[in-house]
Amino acid sequence: MFLAFAGGVLLAFGAWSWSLRRRRRAGQPFGTAANDDTPMEVVSGWYRQRRADGQVVEAVDDRTWRDLEMDGVLRALDHCRTPIGRQQLLETLRATPDSTQRSRRSHLSEAISAHGALQAEVARALDHHHGYGGYALWRLMRTTELGGPWLRLAPFMTMASVLLLAVAPFKPLAIAVFIPLAAIGLWLRTYATGTVTGLIGPFREISPVLRAARELTAITDPALTPYAEQLRALGDQLRSLERVSRWVSREVVTSNELVGGVYEYVNLVLMLDANALLLASRALQRQRETLEQLCLLLGQVDVAHAVSSVRSVLPVWCRPTRGTQSGEAETLAFEGVGHPQLPHGVPNDVTLTAGRGMLLTGANMSGKSTLLRILGVNVILGSSLDTCVARAALMTVERVVTCIAHVDDFAASKSLFFAEAEVVVRHLRLGDAHVPSLFLFDELFRGTNAAERIAAAEAVMRRLVGAADGGNRSLVALATHDLELTRLLADCFDTWHLEVTMTDGHTDFRYRLQAGPARMRTALALLEQLGAPADVVMSAATRAASLDARAERTGGS
């Protein structure tokens, strides 16, 4: 009796201390990034698996994600409070948008922004789930059998152990049978638990995830109701899995060394962890889809909360206007567009229309590539999070395709030009599909000679913008140093440049978009500022002037 009482006290103390630590955990303040340093390959694991399973349709491919440096954008937008939310933020940015889900999520974000009490309640509920094991919850949803087939022997061995101990006072020979049985049980436990070592953390997060869901269902706000109703129904179905997960993860006993020690002695006889794994395996077989649906919903609530938090710190933002009138051309228009990672950047007004592309010229370091990335990032943010870093935005395209960062593919033995040509051919096929898209190119075909570079760039641009057949609905922007293209494409492209001034040899980059081609050159000035020999700079300047004069005489640029 005394031992039973002492064991109960120890268990109660362990549960209380664990609960106290949870309550003391302070969540991140509203309006601040999560500052989470989890490797991106871990964060993206769930999305990559769902993509491989055909559960999501990808809108932003790997090339575009890298070109737009979206890992950094994701970190800047990551005001999520849970691992599941962080994973869902990544999926929301990369997957083809669901307009109904986007509208519902944006409505919740606006409600959170408008009501401080709702913001605090949602944050408090989400803060239950924060463990690193949450990043691997998706692995539980894909697991077919935990611990292997030998685990099915665990219940029979437990019953045999209990029976042998019960008859041992009357039949001492039972101890001789129990000892080898316990040794076999120890091996079975070690084998079974060793196969699921990486899943103990995810199991430990099932209970916090369900607690977060339950607290969200208790919040009475109309904007949260669509989520709360589904979370409540799914949570009720997962109660048995929650109990099993606590057993598997030893949620209570691991919080206290003494309680844990007592548990290990009992576990040696009753094989508690092996039986828990068996029950968990069967529960997951029945409820994996339910668990995934609940995690997706919880993640979307966290994304909505994060979007509200991000909006509160952006210097300017807007919800984009979508769609065109019948017969109107596809259009992308931003007023004062910026970048979420550049709060003090120079805003610009940009308009692109199908059938009329944009040639962006300018000196080195003037911001051409950055402006292309700004356009691409804002289309992604507008289509996925219903948020653009601009004063106003009109979007009739929701797909971005890029060819910005140029590198050799050394592993595949592909030159710069070959690797780039593969991308361009793929983009041409996408353009021919007549799906409204924004194509962004930076220094097209830089890996080949000037004559073929200019000729190929002209042909590709004409095809994408629709000048060749009049049927393409794509929006196209090309950053280039080849001013010859401004003359060759004058009938279907408008030319712009980013403002640069030079005073007493000092280059001042204004980053403001201006109509017309760039006339200022900064490459030689930069060489001089970096300390290149004066005779080298002078010789280069003389040759550049000679080449310009020759181009003028032959009608070039």
Where are these regions (language model features)?
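ATPase nucleotide-binding head domains, primarily ABC-like/P-loop NTPase cores
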Residues: L188, V307, L314-S557
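Alpha-helical coupling/stalk and coiled-coil linker elements that connect catalytic or binding modules
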Residues: M1-A363, T370-G376, G382-R399, V423
